[in-house]
Amino acid sequence: MLHHYGKKYYSLGSSILVTSSPEPYLLLASVAGAAFVVLVTTAASKHGTVVGGVLTALPLTGAWAVAIIGVTQGIGSATGAVGGYLLGAGVWFSFLLSYAILAKWGFWQALALAFLVWGVMTSVVFVSGVRDFLTCLAGGTALSIAILCVYFKRLKFEDYKGERRDVGWTKLVARFVGSFAILLVALGLSSVRGPFLGGLVSTAPIISSQIVYWTYIEQDIEFSRSVTKNIVLTGTILIIPYGASIWWFYQYFGRSFGTVYGIFFGTLCGYGIAAVGAYAAYRVATFLAEKQILASQSSP
């Protein structure tokens, strides 16, 4: 019964939403994205790399992009954008990993090469024709976990504390202006080239590049590299479950409630999986340590 109701609501909602004028929503989305950059960079500078990374990886900008695609183009387009959003998360993390590895040779060289990596991978994903939701989910998840393993097994960045100091209005305005186009570009591409590309670009590194730039300017290169680790960690925990949740909830509850339920259940599921994984890793590590102690005690 719920399924039938959802389809009826959906059909009606789509016919209404497609006729919505996109301009106010595009402007509002751009303002929200720029304000988000100001918030995150200020929090990272004051409270450290963990806070900055966690805030950056919250699925807020992607959720906003998918929701506004639903407003301007219909719910069907919004659900079509989720596949690109999921694969885009893995490609976005590739950008961050590339920057983190290359940054020790220079900030601007690393940033330029990281954008090149992101551009090539985005183009490959788009022209490959992969649109199936489960394929996008599996691909985005596998890529995200692989990149996370590189961070924790190979790079092993330390976390840094921030400095509680006032940030001048000039810097805040510069951050806002420099980040204004993030969702405007994504939504514009979705209307021209289809919602899948809009979802793919909604996780574009435009916001995170601003964040690593400002943390580099205000702190140093190691602080900036460390932020990327926490972005990938939080993003892997939250973005993939959120994307899967919103894809399902959109079909039954529409844009508004689908977004709310998707954020709630995606976050709950993500942190639940992370907690179970952390506990399992702790138990395995404890077992191996106890086994090693027993072996050393039994040896002559």
Language-model segments: which ranges?
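Hydrophobic alpha-helical transmembrane segments in multi-pass integral membrane proteins
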Residues: 69, 123-130, 180-191, 239-255
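A generic, lipid-embedded transmembrane alpha helix
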Residues: 56-72, 238-243
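Cytoplasmic-side transmembrane-helix entry/capping segments in multi-pass membrane proteins
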Residues: 50-59, 105-116, 134-141, 163-176, ...
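Selected transmembrane alpha-helices and immediately adjacent juxtamembrane segments
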Residues: 27, 154-197
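Transmembrane helical segments that form the transport core of multi-pass membrane transport proteins
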Residues: 181-219, 225-226
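Structural signature of hydrophobic alpha-helical transmembrane segments
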Residues: 21-33, 55-56, 75-91, 134-143, ...
